[in-house]
């Protein structure tokens, strides 16, 4: 008989590992999951492919609110859609975006000034899962609650989940429009054998197919943002910036606290993580670099942070190395023609002014360019 051991400090994790251990596929489980995670990080599959049915809510909570590094669509991808938004636009929430805005509301009191749409199918699904989770243990949900990144409803995790799901339903009713799409319901009947996640997404995306209204999808699935480029879609970040700009920086901070990758970064986040790095303490400067690699709109925040830090330091050795890496990351996604542009020339001219710290920053950007082109 194969033994298993219970760690008194991590009882739930021990039981979860035991279940996997006794599974006939246990020898391949971790390898298969790691392959899926690698594919997800490369953008080859959506996060939903990492979720084990029927624990859909718990699966998204683990992705969004642990140290997993969930990847959101980079905000700059939405800019061309923003110009199409008008007073008649209606915004449709996908499940991960709904959970993200709900938990941000729990931490900050945020309420959307424009009520987004939640499909009636998604609303009823969440109400069903509220009951489902009373009788079924969700290890991913437990992990998210214990992470410390989201508001706690109760010290008892089981009670917390029940209270949280009740609050989620109430938040939807208070802050969203619950809309039924009859055309989508008709389509859904023909897709009864599809997975829960597939049917939820099909129903949500069907709003965008209608000709009678100006619908915009709010989606934080990076993969979907790539395959639906012809459809109007924005990220939660853009939605908050457009209609609750007073909450925008707090939302960016919240996403960074939750290890969500790809969102824009504030100058303060970059400064704080650099100071931790310089002090030799625990820091997330590598995550800052990873986010900036694919989010060039954070370049201004990097520039401002580097000038702020360089202007107050005498010994700039660590800073020069760190910000050379940051600038190189922010240049990666740009066309190399950028370095021949007037914008680049203006940057170098500005950093040549005899202002304290500018010479250090100029050295960083020129080193970054040299490394990138070598």
Spans of features found by a protein language model:
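Active-site-proximal, substrate-binding regions of enzyme catalytic domains
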Residues: 1-57, 82-216, 222-373
């Amino acid at each position: 008989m194969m033994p298993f051991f219970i760690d008194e400090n991590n009882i739930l994790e021990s039981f979860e590992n035991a279940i996997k251990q006794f599974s006939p596929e246990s020898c391949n489980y971790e390898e298969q999951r790691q392959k899926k995670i690698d594919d997800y990080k490369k953008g080859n599959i959506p996060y939903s492919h990492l979720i084990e049915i029927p624990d859909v809510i718990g699966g998204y909570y683990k992705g969004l609110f642990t140290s997993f590094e969930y990847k959101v669509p980079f905000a700059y991808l939405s800019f061309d859609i923003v110009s199409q938004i008008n007073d008649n636009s209606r915004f449709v929430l996908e499940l991960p975006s709904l959970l993200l805005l709900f938990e941000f509301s729990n931490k900050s009191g945020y309420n959307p000034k424009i009520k987004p749409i939640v499909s009636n199918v998604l609303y009823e699904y969440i109400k069903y899962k509220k009951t489902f989770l009373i009788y079924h243990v969700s290890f991913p949900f437990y992990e998210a609650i214990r992470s410390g990144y989201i508001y706690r409803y109760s010290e008892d995790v089981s009670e917390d989940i029940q209270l949280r799901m009740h609050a989620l339903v109430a938040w939807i009713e208070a802050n969203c429009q619950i809309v039924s799409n009859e055309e989508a319901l008709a389509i859904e009947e023909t897709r009864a054998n599809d997975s829960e996640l597939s049917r939820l997404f099909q129903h949500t995306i069907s709003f965008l197919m209608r000709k009678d209204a100006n619908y915009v999808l709010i989606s934080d699935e990076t993969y979907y943002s790539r395959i639906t480029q012809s459809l109007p879609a924005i990220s939660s970040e853009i939605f908050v910036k457009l209609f609750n700009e007073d909450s925008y920086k707090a939302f960016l901070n919240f996403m960074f606290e939750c290890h969500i990758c790809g969102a824009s970064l504030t100058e303060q986040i970059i400064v704080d993580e650099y100071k931790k790095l310089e002090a030799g303490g625990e820091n997330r400067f590598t995550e800052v670099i990873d986010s900036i690699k694919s989010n060039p709109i954070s370049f201004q925040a990097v520039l401002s942070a580097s000038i702020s830090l360089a202007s107050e330091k005498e010994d700039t050795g660590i800073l020069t190395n760190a910000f050379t890496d940051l600038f190189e990351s922010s240049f990666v996604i740009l066309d190399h023609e950028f370095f021949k542009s007037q914008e680049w020339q203006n940057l170098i001219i500005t950093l040549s002014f005899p202002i304290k710290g500018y010479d250090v920053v100029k050295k960083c950007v020129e080193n970054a360019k040299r490394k990138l082109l070598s």
